């Protein structure tokens, strides 16, 4: 067992049930640390941590700092979700107990490992999870910390026996600059978290600064299909830094491969792998790709849908190869990847209607998920089939954060127009106070497809069941409690009268 730094031997975590915080707690417990924490409500994550020995209190008060014998050596929190006047943070300051952010703990836990960090505006959790599953299939036992629960492992974090540590690097508050990785994957870059950064330029710059943290001999893997990450790769190459490598991945067609141009450097950026095609199949898809230096394409059937997921898989492939894994075994591992909790997760099927759940809460994520859903009801290779003609995409969208809804209301509406029918719920405010004039109606009013604004969450399942017909796909979407509706929609479908033919 790897010894913990002295300051992490007794840790109190404010908001311990969150995806990122609970993962850190798991690793600390696995490495022999004592952990206490608090959270606003009971959850599956809290129950799992208690079962592993953590002392967790529901609600926040100063006495929570006495859950561990002798009190904590440090208090850990997150930048955005926990207010500064939280009584535990106030008490920690009174006692002189250091308060640090979650990324600082993760950086300490990574010391002595080869670190593989996945960053980008979207796709971090899925790509990180694919890399973990691929490495595990290849016989590695990596430590990992992921922002979602891997369906195969049933957990979001693990203390491994090997020297590889895989994690996603969250850019939302700039704290990813605390890491000094060996490998960085950047899936995409576009405006987000402007409430923190203040400008698009400042947001983009944090990725440049992050790449500057690469250790000598390190590797940047960047998606060339995305303008933001492609521009980052080109800037790094143009900067002349000679102690790191830059490797791109992205789409190409068969003609480019046959002409020998697919693997030519893009403004100096070396190309490692090309996606040649992706076709939807049931709840997954088949992707075709070719690696640089190989003369033939490879094909892999995946259990997760969407072209964006195919690109994520190629990023994971390049990273796993850099870790020393064999290509054939990596591909087998990716074929067995069953997805991540709340990332286009299959909830169930009732009366011919497939129900999925997704965490998408940014317009680009919404577009990617709805595009993948459209492929499932209207497959590229069977666009004339009866099934394809009948199937529709119905999205139940819950906007996340008042500030994000106000900033991107029109963009959300444009993305939601990729669905055939839209149900918009009210805003899930999370840490934010309501803003005048900002509600789900602000998004719904700009949707041009058939749209229903439903401010009452409890009424949504019956409403959706009445809209859905056999062959349709329903997606519950958002970063809030919309995820609870999936099972309720299936129940409503089960008990609803048989729908009349369209």
Curated annotation (Swiss-Prot):
Keywords, sorted A to Z: ATP-binding, Cell cycle, Cell division, Cell shape, Cell wall biogenesis/degradation, Cytoplasm, Ligase, Nucleotide-binding, Peptidoglycan synthesis
Any one cellular-component term (Gene Ontology): cytoplasm
Subcellular location: Cytoplasm
GO BP annotations listed: cell division; cell wall organization; peptidoglycan biosynthetic process; regulation of cell shape
Pathway field: Cell wall biogenesis; peptidoglycan biosynthesis
Positions annotated to bind ATP: 120-126
Pfam families given in the database record: Mur_ligase, Mur_ligase_C, Mur_ligase_M
Enzyme class per UniProt: ligase
EC number: 6.3.2.8
Catalysed reaction equations from the record: UDP-N-acetyl-alpha-D-muramate + L-alanine + ATP = UDP-N-acetyl-alpha-D-muramoyl-L-alanine + ADP + phosphate + H(+)
Any one GO molecular function term: UDP-N-acetylmuramate-L-alanine ligase activity
Membership in a protein family: Belongs to the MurCDEF family.
Matching PANTHER family: UDP-N-ACETYLMURAMATE--L-ALANINE LIGASE (PTHR43445:SF3), UDP-N-ACETYLMURAMATE--L-ALANINE LIGASE-RELATED (PTHR43445)
UniProt function note: Cell wall formation.
Protein name per its UniProtKB record: UDP-N-acetylmuramate--L-alanine ligase
Lineage, top ranks: Bacteria, Bacillati, Actinomycetota, Actinomycetes, Mycobacteriales
